[in-house]
């Protein structure tokens, strides 16, 4: 059955407008984004099939380009639109955090950094810069590629800390493999950055590693001391 033949209150767009976006299921949200179905499948049926194929909404959103565009009903244009929407969400989150100083607990910090890093297909290294009261000043991704001691330049972290007039910071990087356990390079690199930043009186409060599941705190796990 075509969506146009459904009762108005059950059509995803109308339902969104009448009841709010929170009333929509994952399939209905995806249907609103897709806009139209394909031959033989209305847009909600298409959305449900895609969620089953990818294993859920999160897996669909994190799918690589080749897997995404290869599916019937998707393609490069929709992939580009989706990436733009995701980036809008991340930037809005970053701006809201910096404006409202909303990182009030270690768990809030981990959730924020996971939102900023988990979509990255390769390793990235970033810093959450904080003031003297540990309120967020800015978040930046500073390095991309294989993250080890050779690829991280302490002087760049120092330079960005001075630029933001930061009193402290939280280091972070992702493990695209999904395993958030730190490597020896992760530990040595963190200690080297702590030493370098101590010279300008900037404290490293933690190093968060984002993989699958809950992000890992190197301080809470005893790998480093704040």
From Swiss-Prot:
A motif (JAMM motif) lies at residues 173-186. Residues 102-224 form the MPN domain. It comes from the Bacteria. It holds the Pfam family RadC. GO terms for molecular function: metal ion binding; metallopeptidase activity. Zn(2+) binds at residues 173, 175, 186. InterPro entries: MPN (IPR037518), RadC_JAB (IPR025657), RuvA_2-like (IPR010994), UPF0758 (IPR001405), UPF0758_CS (IPR020891), UPF0758_N (IPR046778). Keywords: Hydrolase, Metal-binding, Metalloprotease, Protease, Zinc. One of its GO terms (biological process) is proteolysis. CDD domains: MPN_DUF2466. NCBIfam families: PRK00024.1, radc. Belongs to the UPF0758 family. This is UPF0758 protein PputW619_0186. It comes from Pseudomonas putida (strain W619). The lineage of its organism: Bacteria, Pseudomonadati, Pseudomonadota, Gammaproteobacteria, Pseudomonadales.
């Amino acid at each position: 059955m075509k969506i146009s033949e459904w009762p108005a209150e059950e059509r995803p767009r109308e339902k969104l407008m009448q009841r709010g976006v929170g009333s929509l299921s994952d399939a209905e949200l995806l249907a609103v984004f897709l806009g139209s179905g394909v031959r033989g499948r209305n847009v909600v049926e298409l959305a449900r099939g895609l969620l089953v194929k990818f294993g859920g909404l999160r897996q669909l959103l994190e799918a690589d380009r080749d897997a995404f565009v290869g599916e019937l009903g998707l393609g490069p244009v929709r992939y580009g639109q989706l990436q733009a929407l995701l980036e809008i969400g991340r930037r809005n989150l970053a701006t809201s955090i910096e404006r409202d100083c909303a990182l009030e607990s270690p768990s809030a910090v981990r959730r924020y950094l996971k939102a900023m890093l988990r979509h990255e297909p390769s390793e990235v290294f970033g810093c959450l810069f904080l003031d003297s009261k540990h309120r967020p000043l800015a978040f930046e991704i500073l390095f991309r590629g294989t993250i080890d001691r050779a690829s991280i330049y302490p002087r760049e972290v120092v330079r960005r800390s001075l630029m933001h007039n930061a009193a402290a910071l939280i280091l972070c990087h992702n493990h695209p493999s999904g395993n958030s356990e730190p490597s020896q390079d992760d530990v040595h690199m963190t200690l080297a950055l702590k030493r370098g930043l101590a010279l300008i009186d900037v404290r490293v409060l933690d190093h968060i590693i984002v993989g699958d599941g809950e992000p890992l705190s190197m301080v809470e796990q005893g790998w480093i001391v704040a």
